[in-house]
Amino acid sequence: MVFKRFLVAALLAVLLLSSASLPVHADQPSSTPDNTTPVSFTDISEHWAKDAIERWASMGVIVGEEGKFRPDDPLTRAEMAVILQRIMRYQTTSTDYFMDLEEEWYVDAIQKLRAAGVMVGDENNRAMPSESITREAAVVLIARAFGIYPTQQELHYEDTESISSWAVGYVSALSQAGYVRGGDNNCFFPAAPLTRAEAVTIFNNMITACISESGDYDYRPFEGLADFVIIGADNVNILNFDIGGNILLTEGVDAETIRLKTVKHYGEIWQYTYDGFKQHLKVYSYIVPVNENLPVCSYDPSLFVKDENGIMTYDDPRYTTYFGVDVSSWQGDVDWHKLKEQGVYFAFIRLGYRGYETGVINLDTKFEDNIQGALDAGIKVGVYFFSQALDADEAYEEAQFVLDNIKGYDISFPVVFDWETVSSDTARTNNIETEDLCQAANTFCNTIADAGYIPMVYCNQNVSMVYYELSRIQAFDFWYAEYKDQPTFYYNFDIWQYSDSAKLDGVPNANIDVNISFVDYSRINP
């Protein structure tokens, strides 16, 4: 994992420049609602890093002594460990102690950084807590803490040969990504010490928001794109924030309790765990962990092409795609021969639905007209049932209803379980549990498969990743709904419903849903 260029480009460059030329912009993060208690020091009133120091001191991340901060003193390795621990909030403590540690204030932080693989010590198993941290060592610790891995890209600093072997890969990674650059005479100065003010400024510039307590955080006064946002507590609601960089959840935070309300996010979401960094996704206002056992979407979004008639194709000779529609009684009377003339290859016909309040199962009033009309026009046909099942028993009832009503029809495309949320306070499915929904989908699809048809699950990003546990339904093909020119779904899908507002001849009185399929199901023998 390598974080975005705009997160730390020119920020870690602080490491490579003298304090007189540091690119300080600490006033930007200071406008965010951190968990703070005002703190100041007597020796920073005229210092270039005053705002950054006061901000991070007020959050309790840095401290001084006897009212002084000593901003231009070198930062020790112990102090760097404590700062990183207060930001990252590691929970696991290594029982493998460095040989040079005694009972001091920094031991807990160092041992937690050791457990996280951030601080590994030297070849003699020493942490050297009282020594000044060098620029190359600071790069290594920061990179490890934030998940930036070493690379072998060739370096072009004048003093490259002076960089230690254990640091050169990290320096290479940060340089390759544009995160660091040379100072005077294009030198890296790997052995030069890092001052306390320089260290604070690095974190101040990297991290726009550092949340350590539960609560609501409204960033409405903040302008521009935020950089790094770190969330170190459960039950956090973030509002009115444009985040250009990454969101990082610290160890142990329950992602299900975080809400990103009225938040635009352009970066990635990661959580540190003892097993390493795990990726998460923003789904509406939710944060959802990535399931590493599911196949990632294999399609290139840029290759989806829509023509002047709204027909979507996929511009890759390795794939053959098929254009289709889905209809219900909402479309009224449909001229299926006109749809066939416009290139419609397949159609999903709504067979029926369960009332979202009453729970009563109904046959779609246009089902028989639509399915017979599509078949007469030579269009391949599948059916879907709009489910509001609460459990497996109701899903079985729905599947049997479908099977009873498709007898005698040539069903060559899938039979679809279409469970959706309903925007109503009285919807019977409002409080459904994931376990019940997954059991319902499996029961419906297995019943359909047992009858000799191809089962499929339909849903959008919200239902698929917030309501379902996708690994529980991955045995079935997936029909994904997202009304955009390019899909953004993280996982693979078989059919994409890309619009619910298409205009096609043959459907004069309503919009129609249109789809692109990567599978010709009529050629599959289930």
What kind of region is each of these model predictions?
Residues 2, 17-50, 58-111, 115-136, ...:
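Feature responds to low-complexity, polar/acidic, surface-exposed segments characteristic
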Residues 4-16:
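Sec-dependent N-terminal signal peptides
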Residues 48-51, 64, 79, 83, ...:
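Extracytoplasmic/secreted proteins, especially bacterial periplasmic and envelope-associated proteins
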Residues 118, 311, 317-443, 449-451:
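Substrate-binding cleft of extracellular glycoside hydrolase catalytic domains
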Residues 209, 403-417, 421, 468-492:
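Structural recognition of alpha->loop->beta junctions
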Residues 214-263, 267-271, 275, 279:
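Short, T/G/N/S-enriched strand-turn elements that build extracellular solenoid repeat scaffolds
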Residues 273-324, 471-526:
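Functionally critical loop-and-helix segments that line ligand-binding/catalytic clefts
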Residues 452-466:
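Aromatic-lined carbohydrate-recognition surfaces of secreted/lumenal glycan-active proteins
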